[in-house]
Amino acid sequence: MKRTYQPSRVKRNRKFGFRARMKTKGGRLILSRRRAKGRIKLTVSDEKKKY
């Protein structure tokens, strides 16, 4: 049986990346909440670039 999580960096960044979050009002709310909480990584885009 094929597993459900088939990682792809491109898909991950397009769906959960910083620019994707900035596109919608809800996404901007997520970012503002994470800033208020003091998160070091706001989005998955903030992880170390390996590619």
From Swiss-Prot:
The keyword NAD does not apply. One of its GO terms (molecular function) is structural constituent of ribosome. Keywords: Ribonucleoprotein, Ribosomal protein. It holds the Pfam family Ribosomal_L34. It comes from the Bacteria. One of its GO terms (biological process) is translation. GO terms for cellular component: ribonucleoprotein complex; ribosome. PANTHER family: LARGE RIBOSOMAL SUBUNIT PROTEIN BL34M (PTHR14503:SF4), MITOCHONDRIAL RIBOSOMAL PROTEIN 34 FAMILY MEMBER (PTHR14503). NCBIfam families: rpmH_bact (TIGR01030). HAMAP family: Ribosomal_bL34. Belongs to the bacterial ribosomal protein bL34 family. This is Large ribosomal subunit protein bL34. It comes from Borreliella afzelii (strain PKo).
